[in-house]
Every structure is written in structure tokens, then in C-alpha cells.
């Protein structure tokens, strides 16, 4: 009965898009109680045009009137495009009559996890509170588990004591605002126009265009249709004897890759890696060497990646990025790969994200992985979804979303027992999936796929991103306004990964 949240969002987009495209336009003048120019006028019009809302009468919307729990549940089912159900056995003691206009919506929302069975009563005629609305929206998006983890994070609202994770997520994703800088007013009832505004905010986020693709070109050749920018690997920055040096990829490989990238309509970036030692060099010399290497190779910009950046070198990296930005022509791009902020601190503490973003065109976020061994199964999800949420939330107020890019691991992580057996590209993973004595799974906890092969001892496990897992991460990016996804080498990018991004 319960559908996965990514399918819900797809249904939402298809339903609302169709409605918005075919419904006759309704002017706010149709409702005498909606003042022209009101802060909620546009959202009210869109909700009515799409069929999500109806006026209380032909001429009155019900501006300022509270939204009941039953009415909001009906609207929620319409928004997500859920197929209504009408079970013979009711879930709640106060929603027992199948003939009631909200009976099917309440049962459907319960089946999809938007509301729970924790109490016997649903209270359909009670005004919905701001807290209840936030909880229902976040649960409808499929983030119940994530909200449980998010309750550990700080909130600016002193008056929130329950459901902190749900309210934090709704607030951080820009679905619902506080009533002041320090208050959320969780018990305050929500009005019909407030519900309309929140739903249209959410609609705009889930209906955003597919993210732009950034690629990493490690192969000799490849097709790059549909990519926005592609980084050519092989560049290295070093500094010795008071001299900065940038080595470029082998010439024939470089020329072939740039040609194929341009043929696909993408920008070709020179990826230059380095370490903490390189950053000890003179900033102006390092920046000049990077600028010269980019121009000599005929690239459209630079993609900088520094390994194991020490916290005490953060200022040096920031200074270098600013110096490079000053040298680059206006039509050249500057991407910087960084470790993302992590729940436990980690390597992300070494970066001044706001300063880097002010000089670079894009920060490519690498999410730190983790492994959990329970004695039977190694859990090693790719780009753990709670870490993706934490990173985007942590950068929400310091880095513009349009300057962020989430990097996804395109290879599979192979484990035998508690020991790593390396990685597998798309072809190798497909061979494993087609092998004997294998079973595939999808972890709702990690929102990541894995396969177990039981014909070997110890059991072999491979964690990987399938279409559903990719959609879960792309969905989070969309909710935060992040417009780019970075993928690894073309040979490791499966059709399932591309489908999760583009469909």
C-alpha cells in the first residue's frame, strides 16, 4: 500500500503540471475576501487554478479562516496525486463514516505515512496547527527517519519542544517560516491562505528543472551529451624551489577529451589536484601557473581539488581561489571541490565555504562516507542521505544554493564481511547483479541500494546508487535549491543513475 516518496513526488509533479496547464485562469477578483496585491494572492490563485483548493463559496475563499485537519489532508492527497482508498475498517474512531467528504483522504494519507496511528482520534474538524502542518508535509515527502535524526540539530526557535526534527526540516528547506527570528509558534493555527502559500513553495521546489550535470572525464574518450561542464583529470599542482608547476594530461588524451566534451555541448575544465604542501607556495605564483595551464590547454575553466586539506591551510586555499578568480577571464569557470560539512565535524572544518563561494563559480560537495558493521552486514551507503541533508542545511545561509553541486559516487562499494573488496564500475556491478545466489535490497534507513551474494564466505555485499537512491538525493538538492549534480567517470555512470537524475 505504501508507495515510495520519490514516486509520490513524480505523481505530484505530473498531476499539478497537468492541472496548471489546463485549468481556466481564476483572478483574485473572483474572491471578494482576497485583496488585490495581498501577500498570498498569487499562491491562492495558483492553488485554485490547479484544483488543490476550492473557495468556501463562489465568491469567498475563506481568507483568514483556519484550515481544518480534514481539509488540509484532502489538499495533501490532491497535491501528491495519491490514489484514494476507502477501506471498510476505519483507522480512527472519529473518522468512521465512508460517506464523509474527508474519509478517503484521511485513510489515504495514513496509508502513505503522512499521518500516524499513534492516537485513536484524528480530530478532523480541529484547526490544523503550524506544527501539525510541518509534520504532515515532511512525512509526506518520505523523511520520517531523517526527521528523527534532524531533531539533534539546533533550531533558532526557543518555543519548539516537540517534533523538532520535522519543524527543522520544513524550516531549513524553506517550506515554512518562523513567526519571528526566535519563535515558530507551533501551536498557532494555520489559515487557509498560509496553507496555500506553503504548498506553492513546496510545488516550486519539487517542480524545479532537472539538475545540470557536471562530469569527471578519466577515460580517453566519451560522449558528454547533456552535461553542463566536464573536468578532465590529470592535472597536478606542485611547488618546489620557489617555483609553481602545473602538469597537464598527456596531449593526445587531452585533445581528444576536450574535443568530445565540446561536441557534447559542455564546457571543458582542467582538473588540477594538489595537497597541503602545494598550498605552502607563493599564492600569486600558484595562481599564475594555474591560469597559464588552463589557457595553454584550451580549456573553458579550472576544477581545483586538494587532497586531505589540513585545517590550518584553509586560509591558503581561500587566498589561492581568490587569486585565481582575479586572473581568469570573465568567460572562464572556476569550480572548487570541497569536503562537505559533516554531522561529526570531519574534514569539512578545514573550509571557509562562504569565502570560497564568493570567488568560485561552483563548490562541488564531497559527502564523507561511513561504514557500520553490526556483526552480520556492513552498512556502507553512498552519500548517506542524512549527511547530504546536514551539509545542505549547514550551508543554507552562507553559500547561495546556485553555487553548490552535490557529487555522487557512481561506483559500487564492495565488502566481504567487514573488509573492503574495492569498488565496481557500471559493467562490473551489472555482472554482480546477474550472478547466481544474489538478492537485491533497498534500505529505507539509508535510502540506498545493496546486493548480497550468499554463495561466498563471508557473504559479499555491494552498496550502490540505483535510480531510486539517486532520486532521493536529487530531491533533497531540489528542496534546497541546489541545481547541479557531479558524476564520476563516464564508464561508471549506469543508465539507472542517469534515469534518477533526468526523469
Question: Where is each model-derived feature located?
Answer:
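Bacterial N-terminal signal peptides
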Residues: 11-21
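Extracellular low-complexity, Gly/Ser/Thr-rich intrinsically disordered linkers
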Residues: 453-503
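Substrate-binding surface in catalytic domains of secreted glycosidases
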Residues: 239-252, 311-433
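Active-site groove signature of glycoside hydrolases
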Residues: 287-316, 362-374, 486
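Glycan-binding loop/region signatures in secreted carbohydrate-active enzymes
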Residues: 403-473
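Conserved, mostly hydrophobic/aromatic
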Residues: 230, 304, 363, 406, ...
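Glycan-recognition patch characteristic of GH18 chitinases/ENGases
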Residues: 209-289
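Feature responds to low-complexity, polar/acidic, surface-exposed segments characteristic
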Residues: 2, 19-41, 49, 54-103, ...
Amino acid at each position: 500500500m505504501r508507495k515510495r516518496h520519490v514516486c509520490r513526488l513524480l505523481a505530484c509533479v505530473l498531476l499539478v503540471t497537468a492541472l496548471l496547464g489546463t485549468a481556466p485562469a481564476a483572478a483574485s477578483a473572483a474572491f471578494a475576501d482576497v485583496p488585490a496585491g495581498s501577500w498570498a494572492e498569487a499562491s491562492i490563485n495558483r492553488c485554485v487554478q490547479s484544483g488543490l483548493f476550492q473557495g468556501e463559496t463562489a465568491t469567498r475563499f475563506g481568507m483568514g479562516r483556519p484550515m481544518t485537519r480534514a481539509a488540509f489532508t484532502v489538499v495533501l492527497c490532491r497535491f501528491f496525486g495519491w490514489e484514494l482508498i476507502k477501506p471498510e475498517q476505519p483507522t480512527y474512531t472519529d473518522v468512521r463514516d465512508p460517506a464523509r467528504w474527508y474519509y478517503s483522504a484521511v485513510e489515504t494519507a495514513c496509508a502513505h505515512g503522512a499521518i500516524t496511528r499513534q492516537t485513536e482520534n484524528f480530530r478532523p474538524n480541529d484547526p490544523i496547527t503550524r506544527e501539525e502542518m510541518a509534520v504532515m508535509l515532511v512525512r509526506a515527502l518520505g523523511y520520517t527517519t531523517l526527521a528523527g535524526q534532524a531533531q539533534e540539530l539546533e533550531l533558532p526557535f526557543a518555543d519548539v519542544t516537540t517534533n523538532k526534527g520535522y519543524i527543522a526540516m520544513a524550516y531549513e528547506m524553506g517550506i515554512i517560516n518562523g513567526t519571528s527570528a526566535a519563535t515558530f509558534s507551533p501551536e498557532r493555527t494555520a489559515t487557509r491562505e498560509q496553507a496555500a502559500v506553503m504548498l506553492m513553495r513546496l510545488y516550486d521546489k519539487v517542480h524545479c528543472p532537472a539538475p545540470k550535470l557536471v562530469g569527471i572525464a578519466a577515460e580517453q574518450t566519451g560522449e558528454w551529451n547533456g552535461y553542463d561542464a566536464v573536468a578532465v583529470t590529470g592535472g597536478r599542482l606542485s611547488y618546489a624551489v620557489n617555483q609553481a608547476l602545473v602538469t597537464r594530461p598527456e596531449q593526445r588524451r587531452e585533445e581528444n577529451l576536450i574535443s568530445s566534451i565540446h561536441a557534447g555541448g559542455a564546457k571543458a575544465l582542467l582538473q588540477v589536484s594538489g595537497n597541503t604542501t602545494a598550498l605552502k607556495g607563493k599564492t600569486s605564483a600558484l595562481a599564475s601557473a594555474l591560469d597559464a595551464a588552463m589557457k595553454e590547454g584550451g580549456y573553458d575553466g579550472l576544477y581545483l581539488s586538494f587532497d586531505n586539506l589540513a585545517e590550518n591551510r584553509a586560509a591558503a586555499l581561500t587566498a589561492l581561489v581568490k587569486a585565481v578568480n582575479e586572473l581568469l577571464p570573465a568567460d572562464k569557470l572556476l569550480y572548487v571541490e570541497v569536503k562537505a560539512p559533516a554531522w561529526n565535524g570531519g574534514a569539512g572544518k578545514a573550509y571557509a565555504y562562504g569565502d570560497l563561494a564568493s570567488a568560485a563559480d561552483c563548490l562541488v560537495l564531497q559527502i564523507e562516507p561511513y561504514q557500520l558493521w553490526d556483526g552480520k552486514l556492513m552498512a556502507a551507503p553512498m552519500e548517506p542521505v542524512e549527511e547530504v541533508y546536514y551539509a545542505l542545511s549547514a550551508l543554507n545561509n552562507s553559500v547561495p544554493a546556485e553555487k553548490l553541486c552535490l557529487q555522487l559516487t557512481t561506483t559500487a562499494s564492495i565488502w566481504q564481511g567487514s573488509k573492503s573488496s574495492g569498488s565496481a564500475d557500471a559493467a562490473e556491478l551489472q555482472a554482480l547483479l546477474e550472478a547466481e545466489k544474489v538478492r537485491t535490497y533497498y534500505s529505507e534507513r539509508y535510502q540506498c541500494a545493496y546486493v548480497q551474494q550468499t554463495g561466498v564466505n563471508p557473504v559479499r555485499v555491494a552498496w550502490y546508487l540505483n535510480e531510486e537512491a539517486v532520486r532521493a538525493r536529487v530531491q533533497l538538492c531540489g528542496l534546497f535549491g541546489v541545481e547541479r549534480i557531479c558524476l564520476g567517470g563516464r564508464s561508471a555512470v549506469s543508465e539507472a543513475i542517469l534515469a534518477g537524475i533526468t526523469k
